[in-house]
């Protein structure tokens, strides 16, 4: 199991061609260990730390190392106003079946529980219940949303919000499950890249630890958000497991 050594909280972050991570680390009010190559980062994964932020290092070899422990899915932590939530699936090839989305919902919920947060799941589908009959695609999406909700309800607090994602956010859901990865990716881009929502990076679900994935072209401000998010997760994770 990956973790911190000797009880010290170590946050490891990668620095590639984009040096903004160095600026972000200097602004953090906690210690950040910077590494400057994929090889160093992978060695840190094997060594153990409280949390990892990929930063501006290339993804391929690092993700391959993470996947040695089993399949991974990503969930993006987004803040809209005072409300924060994990949005998944966000990879365009993820969450294609109800079973896939159930596994993602469970992984995201268990991840939050390890940080001391109680999951509240919002399931999103392609229409309101009154839209049944408008098209086969809408019908399928709504029925899948209902079925997924029935699968989750014995494990976590959950509600099927149909297409009303704004209500899921307003109600304080901290796990939001999109109808598929393409839709999740579009929701992310609409909220963060077009709108004013803030992204703190994507956590790797299925990794036995805390790994926050970030863009290689992120600003120093964006990397600082990711570092603070990783630190917040690590503190909750450690307190919950003491």
Swiss-Prot record:
Keyword Methyltransferase appears in the UniProt entry: yes
Transmembrane segments annotated in the record for this chain: none
Keywords noted in UniProt: Methyltransferase, Transferase
Molecular function as annotated in GO: methyltransferase activity
Disulfide bond sites: none
SUPFAM superfamilies: Isocitrate/Isopropylmalate dehydrogenase-like (SSF53659)
This enzyme's EC code(s): 2.1.1.-
Enzyme class: transferase
Record bears the keyword Transferase: yes
Any one Gene Ontology BP term: methylation
Family: Belongs to the MtxX family.
Protein name (record): Uncharacterized methyltransferase MTH_231
């Amino acid at each position: 199991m990956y973790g911190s050594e000797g009880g010290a909280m170590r946050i490891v972050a990668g620095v590639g061609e984009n040096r903004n991570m160095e600026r972000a680390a200097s602004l953090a009010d906690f210690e950040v260990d910077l590494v400057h190559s994929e090889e160093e980062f992978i060695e840190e994964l094997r060594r153990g730390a409280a949390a990892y932020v990929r930063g501006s290092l290339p993804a391929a070899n690092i993700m391959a190392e993470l996947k040695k422990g089993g399949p991974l899915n990503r969930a993006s932590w987004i803040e809209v106003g005072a409300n924060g939530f994990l949005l998944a699936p966000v990879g365009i090839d993820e969450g294609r079946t109800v079973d896939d989305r159930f596994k993602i919902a469970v992984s995201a919920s268990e991840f939050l529980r390890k940080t001391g947060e109680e999951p509240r799941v919002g399931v999103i589908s392609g229409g309101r219940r009154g839209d049944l009959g408008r098209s086969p695609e809408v019908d399928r999406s709504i029925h899948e949303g209902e079925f997924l909700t029935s699968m989750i309800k014995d494990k976590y607090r959950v509600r099927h919000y149909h297409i009303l994602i704004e209500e899921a956010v307003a109600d304080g859901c901290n796990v939001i499950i999109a109808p598929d990865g393409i839709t999740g990716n579009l929701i992310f881009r609409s909220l963060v890249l077009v709108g004013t929502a803030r992204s703190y990076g994507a956590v790797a679900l299925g990794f036995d630890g805390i790994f926050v994935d970030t863009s290689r072209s992120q600003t120093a401000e964006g990397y600082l958000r990711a570092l603070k998010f990783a630190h917040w997760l690590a503190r909750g994770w450690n307190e919950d497991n003491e």
